[in-house]
Amino acid sequence: MKQFANLHLHSTHSDGVYTPEELVRIAKNEGYRALALTDHDTVSGNDEIRAVCEREGLDYIFGCEFSSPWRERRTNFHIVGFDFDPEYPEMKEYLAQRSFCEAEQTRILFERGLAEGLLHDITWDEVLDYNRGVTWLCNNHVFNTMKAKGLVADLDYMNFFHTVYGKRRGEVKPPYESKPIDKMLRLIRDAGGFAVVAHPHNKLDVIPELIGMGLSGLEVWHHLLTPEERLKALELAKVNNLFISGGSDHDGLCGGYYSSFEHPEESEFYVPECSCGTQEFFFREIKTRTLHSEREAVIEGCIDLEQNANY
């Protein structure tokens, strides 16, 4: 099913491959007509992508992806917050904390890598300088700086990641904790936004509980959901009046991870063009924050299309 809007994207402002401007160009060429940049715990790229979308004639909605634990269930959720005010005091403070945590963890492991001889011929100041304007600094930003200096090539990434970062990230305790799921949902709402659960492929059974905490929607067309899970998600959205979202995340052309493959369909990151995202009808609901009376019939039509495609 060809999608209209791609509402789950990552840029170089978090752990994505492309700049916001590059993302718009690639998404437009692929066929998308509306976008949301949902970088991890940061909104530093949103002004840029909004401006480029306006210039290129694409629709846009403000977004960010947060990670929240649900300790009682011993699991973690990714929550996309849409259309909130990043200047709302508590949200502004939380975004600053999350960026500081990521950058500080990255810096500490970077310094350990230097001390242990795992890294060389690079300084933290060079990482900061190369990634100006980025506040949420992760291992990708270190690697990209090294690549720009000619110290590594793309094929070196996995060895770099597992040697310098990888499981070692657990050795560095963050100075601030992520907000648990109930408090994260409340903060997004208090900041004037609404929340959608990202790629709920193995968490659909707890959606009713999350609705009670303030969840407003869920992703349906995301590569991690099986055909059966997409059908279940559509039914949940219909019965519970939930917004329907979706996006390519780190996969597909916008993910950037199979651009070097001669045959992209051989990559684990491959998805058919414009297959992840959401339909124009559901995007308009999200954009206007209004559920339309004909949505049940539209959802039933999507269910029929999904069933016919799968059987």
Predicted regions mapped to residue ranges:
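An N-terminally biased module of ancient metal coordination in phosphate/nucleic-acid-related enzymes
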Residues: 1-74, 164-167, 173-189, 194-197, ...
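Generic detector of intrinsically disordered, low-complexity, polar/charged segments
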Residues: 13, 60, 78, 147, ...
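Extended substrate/RNA-proximal surfaces in nucleic-acid metabolism proteins
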Residues: 54-208, 287, 301-309
